[in-house]
Amino acid sequence: MRRPGAAALAAAALALAGCAQIPREPITQQPMSAMPPMPPAMQAPGSIYNPGYAGRPLFEDQRPRNVGDILTIVIAENINATKSSGANTNRQGNTSFDVPTAGFLGGLFNKANLSAQGANKFAATGGASAANTFNGTITVTVTNVLPNGNLVVSGEKQMLINQGNEFVRFSGIVNPNTISGQNSVYSTQVADARIEYSAKGYINEAETMGWLQRFFLNIAPW
């Protein structure tokens, strides 16, 4: 025979497990880096031209073209958004009618007058605003080359400061025609750009809601 206390403990354990913090997954494309493919074996045909040479031509610019090449992303994001909404409804009704009474009830009540009134009114307003600014630079790696020549890039930068580990991640699709002579491109010119700035450490843990507080927040009816 099972004890009721064991079932209660199991239910409490499941409830607390449901309130546990969900690990946050990165929004950037993985992996963060890619190695270039191995070049073919060198051949010695006995002439100046070597078809197995994997380096860049002498008069070719140094812009990234292949998997493993690096590119500098200039992050310059400034986004402002404002939203407002409102709703207003008003409805009123009034009804009155007489109901004749028959038989011996007529002498008692004569006529019964019935009336009904109703009113319904609703008014609501809402608004939201957001402003985000992110400036900086990060160097990423070409992880894939699409059939049309666009470059899939991703990379991260980690900084260990005292007791906290801060990192910046970036991924997106770059058109090689937008890359400048300094081998850089603005984040506003990157398609499907995903920028992530986060941290791990005591400061980040202090900003996280405790498990017991999340438990009462989930079961609170208000």
UniProtKB/Swiss-Prot annotation:
Pfam families: FlgH. GO terms for biological process: bacterial-type flagellum-dependent cell motility. A lipid is attached at residue 19 (N-palmitoyl cysteine). It is found in: Cell outer membrane; Bacterial flagellum basal body. Disulfide bonds: none annotated. Its main location: membrane. A lipid is attached at residue 19 (S-diacylglycerol cysteine). PROSITE patterns: PROKAR_LIPOPROTEIN (PS51257). It comes from the Bacteria. Keywords: Bacterial flagellum, Cell outer membrane, Lipoprotein, Membrane, Palmitate, Signal. Residues 1-18 form the signal peptide. The keyword Methyltransferase does not apply. It is a lipid-anchor. The keyword Transmembrane does not apply. One of its GO terms (cellular component) is cell outer membrane. GO terms for molecular function: cytoskeletal motor activity. The basal body constitutes a major portion of the flagellar organelle and consists of four rings (L,P,S, and M) mounted on a central rod. Belongs to the FlgH family. Assembles around the rod to form the L-ring and probably protects the motor/basal body from shearing forces during rotation. NCBIfam families: PRK12697.1. This is Flagellar L-ring protein. The gene is flgH.
